[in-house]
Amino acid sequence: MTDILIDDTATEAVRTLIRAFPLVPVSQPPEQGSYLLAEHDTVSLRLVGEKSNVIVDFTSGAAQYRRTKGGGELIAKAVNHTAHPTVWDATAGLGRDSFVLASLGLTVTAFEQHPAVACLLSDGIRRALLNPETQDTAARINLHFGNAAEQMPALVKTQGKPDIVYLDPMYPERRKSAAVKKEMAYFHRLVGEAQDEVILLHTARQTAKKRVVVKRPRLGEHLAGQAPAYQYTGKSTRFDVYLPYGADKG
């Protein structure tokens, strides 16, 4: 479990959000490793000995640029966004792709199993809902805390199958900026091992009605060693598309 240091300046909204996740309140930072810090109106991830931090902010920086200037063209094609599909993001992480998909007008159900990451993402969505420029997009994201491979079958029984299941398993960010590399290093250290790829892909193909879209590095290996039906390839990233079991590629 992850420690969280709650500063006296933390708002009641932040304190309420924190209680939704199994975190360990502490009175001072740990001697080593990572921890969450709740202060003012934000929850951030800190690494002992480092000045920088990680927060989920959909209202500025890279998220704002992608929202106002584009940048989601390839993922839009991969999910066939013009058909207005419902999307379940089974590996939400810090929510960047969920937000891009929601900014395309799609309804996104996001799953995140790590309590600290889910807390960071939930906080980012909460603040985005308060911003007039992002509130409509944020309102289209429904976050579920838990293991997607375990939760999706149960959710299908109550909501039916989604059109798309989206997967973005963790992989090294070799060509990203130094700031992004440091952020991902924090993230990987916090999360540790990723979900079982075989089980995740299998469950996704059982769940989706139309397709499973997997984000990979352009030259990366196929997820779980399984070749996709087809691909959308960009300069540094590609999207592998798998069909649901029993579906006809044609």
From Swiss-Prot:
One of its GO terms (molecular function) is rRNA (guanine-N2-)-methyltransferase activity. It catalyses: guanosine(1516) in 16S rRNA + S-adenosyl-L-methionine = N(2)-methylguanosine(1516) in 16S rRNA + S-adenosyl-L-homocysteine + H(+). GO terms for cellular component: cytoplasm. It is an enzyme of class 2 (transferase). It comes from the Bacteria. Keywords: Cytoplasm, Methyltransferase, rRNA processing, S-adenosyl-L-methionine, Transferase. Pfam families: SAM_MT. S-adenosyl-L-methionine binds at residues 96-97, 168. SUPFAM superfamilies: S-adenosyl-L-methionine-dependent methyltransferases. It is found in: Cytoplasm. Its EC number is 2.1.1.242. Belongs to the methyltransferase superfamily. RsmJ family. HAMAP family: 16SrRNA_methyltr_J (MF_01523). Specifically methylates the guanosine in position 1516 of 16S rRNA. This is Ribosomal RNA small subunit methyltransferase J. The gene is rsmJ.
